Amino acid sequence: MRILIPFIPLLTSISYAAEKNIIFIVTDDQSPTLGCYGDPVAISPAVDSLAQDGTLFKRAYATTASCSASRSVILSGLHNHFNGQFGHQHAYHKFASFHNVVALSLPRVLSNAGYRTGQIGKYHLAPEEVYRFDTYLKGNARNAKQMASVAKNFITADDEKPFFLYFATSDPHRGGGDDASYPGGHKPNFFGNLPNKAAYEGVDEVFFDPNKIPVPPFLPDTPESRSELAHYYQSCARIDQGIAELIKILKESDLYDKTLIVFTSDHGMAFAGAKTTVFEAGLHVPFIVRNPYEKKRGIESYAMISHADITPSLVDFAQALDREKNQPKNFVKADAYWKNKDYVAKDNRGHRPYTSYHGDSWIPILGKKNASHHETMFASHTFHEITMYYPMRTVWDGKYKLIWNIASGLPYPFASDLWASSTWQAQLEKGDDALYGYMSVGSYIDRPAFELYNVTENRYEEVNLASNPEYSKILESMKAKLKAFQKATNDPWISKWEYE
């Protein structure tokens, strides 16, 4: 007995630590088109099973509908106008987060907390030293099932440390060219699907009838929209098979009930009217959390959460968050980290200090159907590519939503793949008065300075109340909230209130 007693605390510690694993799944340009969100045609049994066994958030939002900028918010807990990732990371004319974000970066903080960290799939943000993982796994980001198989050895490694796996698909992002098999002059994009109805290795591809696809109200109900949506749904169904494989690996390894699983997307689907906008269709994302330690399951929550909440939540789950200060417990100041690292230019380190997260942990509200989180939400978009400058700032309080189009007067810029899409081009060639969903082509391109919507009555933002004198007090109140947010988060574009 005297031999065993000293080892009991050690064994308990190892067992507990090894249980607090995290898998964070982020898809690429996916709206809540899932069975668990009521979509009538989606094939998503694996994701649906996570919802049945966890908490599904009905009001979860990205803070920007652009890939790199959104991913920087996900992995820093900071709005992109503050972390420096103003737009896309790729190409020579790229953006990158400020180096001082290293103090709050999710993979860095979890590594400091004793996690082994791994990444597979799409990365698409910079600098790597700020968002560094211990292990980078190589997999086909268009084949989530193969990605899961590649990640198996990392997940099941014989290691007393808990793991954090960042699992990022490239589906259902546009890509792979256009499908020439469709009739007409405008061909749908493949959305990563293979030509001639071929299948990725190990995947049972699911094909959708364009005539049976539900067309969301922000899109025109045209053959072009339907054919592209059919490819989009196929790409989403492929993701689900990868998640099923992940779940299988976890269960076979006795890790399913020791692993937090989060499923979301960087922002809404890759169609004009959604991606790169701050409209509902651009920011509303699927968000499901399965916490194995939460007894209440199958919960649908109407609490408002955002991508800025992700990093503090996962750090909180790892018991590494100082909730009072909203910062890591073992906080490593950025200046201390970069000391003696002269290769990092001091003029690119960003704001001082980076000491706390903009978002808040949702761990305490998991399993609580009637819990609230944020009363007011904010979104911030500035660039997509560097040539696609159109800063927008947004605030909504559950009833009213204000959009400030800072560059109003300039034509609204398009992501190149959205501009080239058959869905958009088919309407564009009909002229400015042609309807694109609930907007005209012309009104989509030429935006007013302010847009005010009652989102409880007008979810998809058809009726702009900003110029209605009956709503002048509400407009000014929302402007004040937006200014306060910009001031609190050191938004450089706050100066535009005064100078433009």
Task: Name every feature range the model reports, one short phrase each.
Residues Q30, G54-T55, T64, L78-F82, ...:
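A generic secondary-structure signal for well-formed alpha-helical elements
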Residues A18-I23, D53-K58, N112-G118, D159-L165, ...:
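Loop/turn elements at helix/coil->beta-strand transitions in domains of secreted/extracellular proteins
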Residues G359-G367, H374-M377:
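Polar, glycine-rich mid-to-C-terminal structural blocks
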Residues F24-T27, S31-G121, L125-K138:
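Active-site segment of extracytoplasmic enzymes that catalyze sulfate/phosphate-ester chemistry
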Residues P32-C36, R59, F82-N83, R174-G176, ...:
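Short, solvent-exposed loop/turn elements at domain surfaces
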